Amino acid sequence: MFEFLDRHPDFEAKLRAFKKRIVALEKKGKKLLTGNGKPCAKAKKKPAGNAEAAARKEALFQKQVRNNVNRIMKRTGWDFDSTREKMLATIERTGCTPTEFFLYRFYELTEEEQDTYYIAKYQKLFQKKYGTNKDFVSLLYDKERTNNYFAEYVRRPWCVNTKVSFEEFCETFKDTERVMYKPIAGHRGYGVEAIYLTPETMKDIYDRLVTYPEGVVEAFIKQHPEMCKLSPTSVNSLRFVTFSSNTVPVTPDGKMMDIAYSIVRFGREGSIVDNLHSGGMVANVDLETGCLATDGADRNGDLWVTHPDTGVTIKGFRIPYFEEAREMVKDAIATRKVEGYIGWDIAISENGPMLLEVNDRPGSDGLQTAPAQAKQGMKFLMEKYM
């Protein structure tokens, strides 16, 4: 009757589990977000005892240690105990996470080389120093509110699956061949689906979508032909990471807004998402030229001179409409008076840039994954904001 594309093999099971989780929360008087995107009064979680919370935190840490030690063992042939010992000693000295120890190849580096890396603990410093407004952060965790707030930059039809009639759905997507469903508070591409639309299947698709957890349904972006060379199935995106303030300079030379860096993310064959954590790849972008400044890298930290599926050479590839995308981010910060340490995800369509998402925790792995094999971190790039 109709075709849902690129669904994870366990999608139906995961969807059922997600719905059960929502029902369970609601029975306890809890809800993730109210209509204005803020936690409802009953949703406030009672703090667990210190011992219980510490035990959960320690269990999660040990799981991350085991997983990443095993990944290193497969790569190096080292034994478990010595690898774990080296990891824990480095974590104690630097404050890195087990995943950073693996991804940035800290097990191969001297202490001096390790100290060149911008690691997760510095993100917490930025979040504290630049203090993104809590109301703005709550907005970013609600895709409906984000799309409304930055409407002039979204530039594509969209709706909320639980708040649209069939007639409105048809009118919104009358000229659309495919749509994307995204959970309202989803992240890292989890739960995203691409769906073909035809006049004959419109009602069936609508009836199916309204049973999903609340989310946004957007017209699938027809990306620029040049971006398709990186991956034709995923919507490949630029990320700009910015620092901005309305009251104090964010750089030593007095700038109130600055773009720290940009990366591009692109998917693998058959995937509709480009996130590094969902199997995609990443490369750094030269902020002046819009050309890729590094080879590509995957979530294992392996480098690719050419894309393994399309064969295109990655380093030197020029992003179309890069200048327009960069200026769009600056304009959004200025017109919405955005403050804080923010990541902006931009797609490049045939007609120019479109805003995908805005993030208050843009991460550090995308910036340093590709340069990792050169044993040179990017802390030097971020020090002026510290």
Question: Where is each model-derived feature located?
Answer:
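Intrinsically disordered, low-structural-confidence terminal and linker regions
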Residues: 1-61
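C-terminal active-site "lid" helix and adjoining low-complexity regulatory extension at the edge
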Residues: 45, 57, 302-330, 334-341, ...
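Conserved N-proximal alpha/beta basic substrate-recognition cap immediately N-terminal to
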Residues: 52-172, 329
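Active-site nucleotide/adenylate-binding loops and adjacent lid/helix of ATP-dependent enzymes
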Residues: 129-238, 243
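Short catalytic/ligand-binding loop motif for oxyanion handling, primarily in non-cytosolic enzymes
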Residues: 167, 188-191, 249, 270-271, ...
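Protein kinase-like catalytic core scaffold
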Residues: 179, 258-260, 354-356
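Phosphate-binding site of ATP-dependent enzymes
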Residues: 198-295
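A glycine-rich, aromatic-flanked flexible loop/lid motif
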Residues: 288-308
